[in-house]
């Protein structure tokens, strides 16, 4: 499947759709470093899409199998640093059992365990980590402002995983989910600028401004 380009962002963003749940697998680069977000199911397809580029980091927004299924193979093939939240990392790397609502997947070592408020530098990109429970206990969003991208006139970017979608939010009825926590997470995201481009784990990209009048109004 061909890579699709996300336009008007402050960094280079493109994506593949993988797996039966149609996960968005993002490739993000500032021209120096490259990261892949949520390698869903096919590491070989991701390698072909990289087309020889060095992969610096693999970011896992949460512990569900449709977001981490190819992480172990991709780490083995590239040597890239795997980053997940400190809360969800134990399930990803096999330190704790897979939750009852999660499908079995190949466990993957987590090289860096991020916490809320961390700033993670990948190349010249400096991503702010926002832990946003609700879908899972340790789900996280990553936020980047234009001064740390390679397109200063582009919009800020939010990697939202399964927290925020176009017109909706992630399910909260799985083990570790909580609508109360989801509402609090949405209120945190609502402080971001309207022009922020949202890169969700499934479905079409959106903006914070577009979701302010629908998703935030309904759920937050």
Give, region by region, the residue ranges found by the protein language model.
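Residue-level detector of beta-strand structural context in well-folded domains
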Residues: 24-26, 112, 117-118, 140, ...
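Conserved S/T- and glycine-rich ATP-binding loop of Class I adenylate-forming
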Residues: 28, 61, 132
């Amino acid at each position: 499947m061909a890579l699709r380009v996300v336009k008007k962002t402050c960094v280079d963003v493109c994506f593949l759709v993988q797996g039966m749940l149609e996960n968005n697998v993002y490739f993000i680069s500032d021209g120096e470093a490259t990261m892949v977000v949520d390698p869903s199911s096919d590491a070989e397809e991701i390698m072909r899409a990289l087309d020889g580029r060095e992969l610096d980091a693999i970011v896992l927004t949460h512990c569900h199998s449709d977001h981490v299924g190819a992480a172990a193979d991709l780490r083995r093939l590239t040597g890239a640093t795997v980053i997940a939240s400190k809360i969800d990392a134990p399930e990803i790397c096999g330190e704790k059992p897979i939750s009852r609502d999660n499908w079995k997947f190949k466990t993957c070592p987590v090289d860096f365990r991020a916490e809320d408020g961390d700033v993670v530098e990948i190349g010249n990109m400096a991503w702010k980590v926002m832990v946003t429970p609700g879908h899972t206990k340790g789900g996280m969003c990553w936020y980047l402002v234009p001064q740390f991208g390679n397109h200063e006139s582009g919009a800020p970017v939010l990697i939202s995983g399964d927290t925020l979608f176009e017109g909706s939010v992630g399910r909260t009825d799985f083990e570790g989910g909580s609508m109360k926590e989801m509402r609090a997470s949405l209120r945190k995201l609502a402080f971001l600028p309207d022009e922020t481009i949202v890169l969700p784990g499934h479905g079409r990209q959106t903006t914070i401004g577009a979701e302010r009048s629908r998703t935030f109004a309904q759920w937050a």
